[in-house]
């Protein structure tokens, strides 16, 4: 009989959002006449912008024309998309990249989960706490976690992000090899100032670490002094990989397109006396394990950068931002301590003192038909909080606020 990779047996039996879905399904089955409003999983609700739909239609028609048909594309992404990414996401912010430092994919989640494959198995990983579960689980699968004790892994370094430090992590006491940072943050909705991000870049340069920087929510930044890219910080190209997504920016959660930036200046030890390029290694990995994002999807992503596309997605994002502002204001008026929601689509809500995260989740679901995400599902430091998302419709957001008020 074949033998399992035992690291997979260390994983919790269920993924956080699968647990939530199971509870919600049970509630709906028991209460078929009650309409449930979800402020839980961070999926968008607005349809794709018309400019994107038009580009999709055109690309589909091309695939039906023998003279225009495209088969396998470049694993790294088509030049037409990499060029506009380089121009509109980076050059306009004073960041210089080469097209071959951009790798287009079918999602930031697989890229974030897979990039750790390039590092030695005994590499030390640091994550913020609370944390997006993929950062931890992918390293558990890779055999880097050690053993679980008191809900934390023995070989993973946790960096608490709590009220007392304004949700900005302190530098780790133990030097890690890989540092996962996500800003604007999921789940807390908080951000790093330019000075704070510069501090992390300087730390990584000093200690020889690599920052894996997830900026999937950068389009929601409203404050001028908050960096949109880690490469706005001098020297970051030598210590950081950046993950970007079209999912929340342009509603691509069901279409799937993202990209990862791996600067050619970024090198790590070869385990001997030399160093190797992470750009070259990621390119090699992708050529072996990935056949590229579909042509029609990349044409749709290209349309996001058109003048019409930018206008349309900015309108959609503005709607989600209004939802976040409504949730923040209403929750504050109800007496909740509220964080995030200014530069991100997430609200981090402190639950009443007499309950815990899952208890408050159950109360909202059972008494108000509302779905949130329990903070404890993101780590120890998330206990006592829940995450609310602003991705609903304005009408559902207003109704959710009304239901929440009825409990207070």
Swiss-Prot record:
EC category: transferase
Q: Pfam family example for this protein?
A: Aminotran_1_2
Cofactors demanded by this protein: pyridoxal 5'-phosphate
Q: Which Gene3D superfamilies match?
A: Aspartate Aminotransferase, domain 1, Type I PLP-dependent aspartate aminotransferase-like (Major domain)
Question: Per UniProt, where does substrate bind?
Answer: 15, 42, 109, 132, 186, 291, 387
Name of the gene = dapL
Which HAMAP family did the record assign? DapL_aminotrans_1 (MF_01642)
Residues bearing N6-(pyridoxal phosphate)lysine are 248
Cite the NCBIfam families for this sequence: DAPAT_plant (TIGR03542)
Biological pathway: Amino-acid biosynthesis; L-lysine biosynthesis via DAP pathway; LL-2,6-diaminopimelate from (S)-tetrahydrodipicolinate (aminotransferase route): step 1/1
Q: So what does this one do? A: Involved in the synthesis of meso-diaminopimelate (m-DAP or DL-DAP), required for both lysine and peptidoglycan biosynthesis. Catalyzes the direct conversion of tetrahydrodipicolinate to LL-diaminopimelate.
Gene Ontology molecular function, alphabetical = L,L-diaminopimelate aminotransferase activity; pyridoxal phosphate binding
Stated name of the protein: LL-diaminopimelate aminotransferase
Q: Name one GO biological process term.
A: lysine biosynthetic process via diaminopimelate
Q: Which family does it belong to?
A: Belongs to the class-I pyridoxal-phosphate-dependent aminotransferase family. LL-diaminopimelate aminotransferase subfamily.
- Reading the lineage from the top rank, the first entry is Bacteria
Residues recorded as binding pyridoxal 5'-phosphate, renumbered to this chain, are 72, 108-109, 132, 186, 217, 245-247, 256, 291
This chain's source organism reads Desulfovibrio desulfuricans (strain ATCC 27774 / DSM 6949 / MB)
Per the UniProt record, which EC number(s) apply here?
2.6.1.83
**Residue stretches in coiled coil:** none
List the keywords (alphabetical).
Aminotransferase, Pyridoxal phosphate, Transferase
């Amino acid at each position: 009989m074949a033998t399992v990779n035992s690291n997979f047996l260390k994983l919790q039996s269920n993924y956080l959002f699968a647990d939530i879905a199971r509870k919600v399904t049970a509630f709906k089955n028991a209460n078929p006449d009650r309409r449930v409003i979800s402020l839980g999983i961070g999926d968008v609700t607005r349809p794709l912008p018309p400019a994107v739909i038009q580009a999709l239609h055109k690309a589909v028609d091309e695939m039906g024309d023998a003279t225009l048909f495209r088969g396998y594309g470049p694993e790294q992404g088509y030049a037409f998309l990499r060029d506009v990414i380089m121009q509109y996401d980076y050059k306009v912010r004073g960041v210089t990249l080469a097209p071959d430092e951009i790798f287009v994919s079918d999602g930031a989640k697989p890229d974030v989960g897979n990039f750790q494959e390039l590092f030695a198995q005994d590499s030390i990983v640091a994550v913020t706490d609370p944390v997006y579960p993929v950062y931890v689980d992918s390293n558990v699968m890779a055999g880097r976690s050690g053993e679980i004790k008191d809900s934390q892994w023995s070989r993973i370094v946790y960096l608490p992000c709590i009220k007392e430090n304004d949700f900005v992590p302190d530098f780790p006491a133990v030097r890690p090899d890989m540092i996962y940072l996500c800003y604007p943050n999921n789940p807390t909705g908080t951000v790093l100032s330019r000075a704070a991000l510069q501090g992390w870049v300087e730390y990584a340069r000093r200690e020889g670490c690599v920052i894996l920087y997830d900026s999937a929510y950068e389009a929601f930044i409203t404050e001028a002094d908050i960096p949109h890219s880690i490469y706005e910080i001098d020297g970051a190209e030598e210590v950081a990989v950046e993950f970007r997504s079209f999912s929340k920016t342009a509603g691509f959660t069901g279409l799937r397109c993202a990209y990862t930036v791996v600067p050619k200046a970024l090198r790590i030890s070869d385990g001997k006396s030399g160093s190797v390029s992470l750009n070259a290694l990621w390119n090699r990995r992708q050529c072996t394990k990935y056949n590229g994002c579909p042509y029609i999807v990349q044409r749709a992503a290209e349309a996001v950068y058109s003048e019409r596309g930018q206008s349309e997605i900015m309108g959609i994002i503005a709607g989600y931002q209004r939802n976040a502002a409504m949730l923040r204001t209403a929750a504050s008026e109800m007496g909740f301590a509220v964080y995030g929601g200014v530069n991100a689509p997430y609200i981090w809500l402190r639950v009443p003192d007499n309950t815990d995260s899952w208890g408050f989740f159950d109360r909202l679901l059972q008494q108000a038909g509302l779905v949130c995400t329990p903070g404890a599902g993101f780590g120890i430091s998330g206990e006592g909080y829940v995450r609310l998302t602003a991705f609903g419709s304005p009408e559902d957001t207003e109704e959710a606020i009304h239901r929440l008020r009825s409990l207070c």
